[in-house]
Amino acid sequence: MFRKTFIRSLAVLTLLAQAPVFAADVTLLNVSYDPTRELYQDFDSAFARHWKAKTGDNVTVKQSHGGSGKQARAVIDGLSADVVTLALAYDIDAISERGLVAPGWEKRLAYRSAPYTSTIVFLVRKGNPKQIRDWGDLVKPGVSVITPNPKTSGGARWNHLAAYGYALRQPGASPQTARDYLAKLYKNVPVLDSGARGATTTFVERGIGDVLLAWENEALLALRELGPDKFEIVAPSISILAEPPVAVVDKNVDKKGTRKVAQAYLEYLYSVEGQEIIAKNYYRPAVDRYARKYATQFPNIKLFPISELGGWTQAQKAHFADGGVFDQIYQPGK
């Protein structure tokens, strides 16, 4: 009797061993800012292959893109993001303040949870007919400047602060003279799109404006896709070091059971393949080895960090909160 039972047990175990192991299907939602579409299309495919090879599971990553501030508000209002990859730390801080992302999120990954950096450059039309060379040229009469709305766009906030930082560095400058400079700049802005990609469309496809204040990656992408026979990149004398951060949305991944995959997804941005994809899409890799490897791909610009303007909490309150500098100086149609 024992022998028969034992043989039956062995037979069952053999069948179980031969049975196929079914792969799990996991779906992540990456809520990102406006001009990262191409980056994450490439990266999502690479991560899915990596995760399949490592675990056997199938991963589908859905993307949502828009102005960074607008995207942060959508997550706060219930958009069920597994990860956020936004334009600036303040937007993830805002999500964290609502209890969706745990405090200290910026310490979870290397380089303050920013796997890539960028900066702000100028995209002008071929031949640079208005002879725009630096920030000071943007306030000249007759120059039309395209930039998004800093109330909704992270890129626009970087544009604004890069311009402000330049103005503060001029001889005899003060916060008041820097504000005056910004007021003159915005008088030359005919339209404020809600996000960086919309501003690029206005400049490139609609033909509006003499100069686009652009993410460096967006300008380089436009040059690649549309050709140097139509546009040129102008590197200003100084610009801001933009550090777009990433984070797992803790409350959502714990509810959905996707934490392990979501965390691995962000960690893979720091891998060899992740950093190569980042560089291919014209973002500056954060990992030193790849930053050095691709340094010649980018203009040599003196960059200053947001900490020189007090950090994002202070800059947001002073410049972009209701009643802040932007509200005080922006007068549409005047």
What is the predicted role of each segment?
Residues A114-T119, R179-Y186, L192-S194, L226-R259, ...:
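Periplasmic-binding protein-like
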Residues G127-R133, T152, G165-A173, N252-K260:
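Short helix-loop capping/hinge motifs at secondary-structure junctions, enriched
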